[in-house]
A protein has these predicted regions:
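Extended repeat-based scaffolds of very large eukaryotic assembly and lipid-transport proteins
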Residues: 1-206
Length: 206
């Protein structure tokens, strides 16, 4: 899968080559399973973001979500993912974790507890699932809009992701709010989403 299968740009191309090279360099006669795990864990702490993200995806396939969650929550310079990288990693790991059933979802919840911002587990789990129409009608729309004002980047990113998934705004309107922007630069975008929510506009069109 990792070498010849699905590609999830912009994270994977160089990481696949690094992964294949490291596997090929394993000593002859070594235990394949142990060698594979050694390579994945080494890539998980690599300085290159694409290698860390690729390892996070492979670990998530094994049912371990700590590395993925840590990367999704990172805010420090040099560790924080760019917007496209964040979206690609989230899409490659979190939906699958939720779709695998209660045990997998419980492991994901534990990863949010251990690696995510304090006190945000329930909100992050809800945003990772995405709201249904009944939840939007009963207040999830306001919750998502107010989450755009969160001090935590991962919360702002998830809130915007869910709002965009629901509303499907134009490219211009989608660009009004950038989660990574400084506080002052986010105010107008937040005001736009609040205005839309006040008009009952946070609803699916179909």
């Amino acid at each position: 899968w990792a070498i010849g299968g699905e590609r999830i740009e912009p994270l994977e191309r160089n990481a696949v080559e690094s992964f294949a090279t490291r596997l090929a360099a394993l000593p002859a006669g070594s235990d394949p399973a142990a060698g594979l795990e050694e390579v994945i864990l080494a890539m998980a702490i690599d300085r290159r973001v694409e290698n860390r993200a690729f390892a996070a995806i492979l670990l998530a396939l094994e049912g371990s979500y700590d590395v993925a969650v840590e990367m999704l929550c990172a805010e420090e310079p040099g560790r924080r993912l760019e917007g496209r990288q964040w979206s690609a990693l989230e899409a490659a790991t979190i939906p699958r974790a939720l779709a695998r059933g209660p045990e997998s979802a419980a492991r994901l919840r534990k990863a949010w507890e251990d690696r995510g911002p304090a006190g945000r587990v329930e909100l992050l789990m809800a945003m990772a699932r995405g709201p249904d129409d009944a939840e939007l009608a009963s207040g999830a729309d306001a919750t998502l809009v107010e989450a755009l004002g969160s001090p935590e980047l991962v919360v702002r990113r998830y809130a915007l992701k869910d709002l965009v998934d629901v509303v499907e705004p134009s490219v211009f309107d989608r660009a009004r709010f950038r989660p990574e922007a400084p506080d002052e630069a986010r105010r107008d975008g937040l005001a736009w989403w609040r205005s839309l929510q006040a008009k009952g506009g946070i609803r699916r069109s179909r």
